[in-house]
């Protein structure tokens, strides 16, 4: 059964999830297996999959009910959301530090000043990862901790923190996956030239990448350039109103917003080049995207073709994903933008289209599409008010979105052999601690189970899905929502910093052990 929670301010502030939102947000809390089975079936997840006996698995190939033997199980965090220690050991402010300290920008005036205090507690957090059983951990490196001014001198104390973190991971048999930028650009560059409004940031980012890879590349060989370009561009800059994402800059035209997207893509491409030039060992280079995912409301040939069309033509994908993977903007998208389209200089697209070794795909929800007799040839369907949501106004329960997102990289963009990692997948739940001290986040288990079932479908059909990083290892600072939303499989008491594994932690632990959906 679904239990509604009280009305929350319908702040569609989490970027990149352009979905219809209802006035009353709802959460799903299921305490009986019958209810879970019913919703799983409704979501298109075979219930029998959860009890099927696993067969012996070969690398890259799933056995019945299981994942390939080399499937990468992991969890993820981001520097600003967990580290704290914003003024320690030479770190200078990032744009989110400045943004958080402006009245009215975050729930309850919350900041990332302390967050999960991971900076001081990383060793025990790594032990928690080992207890969970993950063999892969995705984290981000804070640019202003390494190069505090955004350019120039390297802060070796900042490097030392990540060096010690990497060593701790390796000592526990956990492979580090480092994201070089997860929204925390140095405030110094915002003050100097407006950060992403200037082309200069691409060169500064590449220089920063070089310094990090030179120092950590002997132990880190999995690099991700930038996380979710849409979020800090489209949501960080706006015309006529303060945007909900740092740097929170008001600009005079929509073209200026699109230009920040182009500069971020350029930074990604130059970052790829810098990583490959600096690494002392062969390395895998990825971009992490949160592209808009579309899926057919009914799986007919006409609707599937409509999904392909929407996937490449809708603005978010046409201005971020398509150029990153093909080296050119989608023509229909640019035509729709008209004078608002980004200005491109000679050689830009060759840099932007650097070949990737891996694509990181952050997937939370999706939109249903059907074929239509209109100029576009498709329509994106609104969701009814009673459609289930996961304690966020944008986070609708659409488990098939994971499968269709993976499939469209192959079918719509022709990247059939590009390995894909699910670099984020998870949900917020309204967790409560029982009198026995348990956190029975059964709705999160439902969510994860249903999405992982669709990961199995993608693998079974031959799509190159290679791993899964659960978001998140622990509750953390959820950007403009502050600490009012909990995405972790580990509860964090922000007063004491105590970590308490939730029921979803135990469930995911068993999934990893048995290498199948349970």
Segments predicted by a language model, with ranges:
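N-terminal secretory signal peptides
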Residues: 1-24
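Catalytic domains of carbohydrate-active enzymes, especially glycoside hydrolases
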Residues: 121-142
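Glycine-rich, proline-tolerant flexible connector loops at the mouths of alpha/beta enzymes
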Residues: 143-154
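Mature N-terminal, pre-catalytic/accessory segment of carbohydrate-active enzymes
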Residues: 16, 33, 37, 55-69
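Conserved functional loop/turn residues at catalytic and ligand-binding sites
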Residues: 33, 133, 173
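N-terminal twin-arginine translocation
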Residues: 22-31, 39-59
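Active-site region of glycoside hydrolase catalytic domains
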Residues: 59-106, 149-151, 159-518
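Aromatic- and Gly/Pro-rich amphipathic surface segment
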Residues: 93-128
